[in-house]
Amino acid sequence: MTSDRSSIDERHEECEELMLKKAVWFLSLSLVLSASALRAQDQNQDSDEIKDTLARAKAKGVLTACADPYSWPYSQQNGTPPGFDIEIFQQIVKLGGMRAEVYWADTGTRGGLGRAFRNSIFAKRCDVFLGLSDNGEDDALPDKLTYTRPYLSLGYVLVVQGKAANLKTLDELKQNNIKIGVSMTTPMDDYLFTNNIPRELYLGNRRIMEGMAKGEVDASMVWATAVAVAKQEFPDAKFHMVDGYVPRPDQRFNSRFAVRKEDKSLLDFVNQSIDQLLSSGKIKQILESYGVPFYPPVS
């Protein structure tokens, strides 16, 4: 009996000792976590006080972009891959020893791009706005923003199938009297009309590609990114872009990012990074991985 009681007492002591050790361990862990949190808070407070945007981003280790969540293949919030603009931005940020974050700014809602600017980059929820086409002049942007250097150009590409599958140029299509699907009241529509090239008018690129998938036309001139979108929507379609086709310079438009005008050091960093990524061929590689042809910026 005495032996049993002694054994029970020993077990109680062991339990109490174990509970005490656990309590000490949890207390120590809490103190470490609290100290780490305080240090991180102090670091964030210190970095928040840095006025220069690029220096502040480097202090935090994060540079944030604004992008449209529903603009694939440029960018998308839910899905992989994330879009070529996102991947290009990630490469830019990597060159600066930072990581990329994205604040999603829907440009397709009421108020459009202007509202997206107000709710994002003007509100300093991000520092770089992605996915902008331009005419080369800053007056296309609000006064508070400025363009970066162009990182690529996009334009109309020639897509063929069926009886036009082996034709390579607009002249060959004209000689064979093959109608070309084109979006009405666009520069390409005007070009085909002016040069007496047979055409079939559609309401937008998506409708053109749907028409090709249905066999309504065997050739089309569409925006470069439209083919990548159509390949997802119509995976069994037989159309393809003509290899080596290069849009005329006056039918191509540069793509750029934008930053706030006061962020001069950030602008210089992004411009230098774009030059480096163009020289290395990285931007071309990213674009072509999305099924979008790469064309260098036009001057």
PLM features per residue range, with description:
Residues 17-26:
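Bacterial N-terminal signal peptides that target proteins for export
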Residues 26-34:
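Bacterial N-terminal signal peptides
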Residues 36-40:
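Sec/Tat signal peptide C-region and signal peptidase I cleavage site
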Residues 102, 108-127, 142-146, 171-172, ...:
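Short helices/loops that flank or line small-molecule/ion binding pockets
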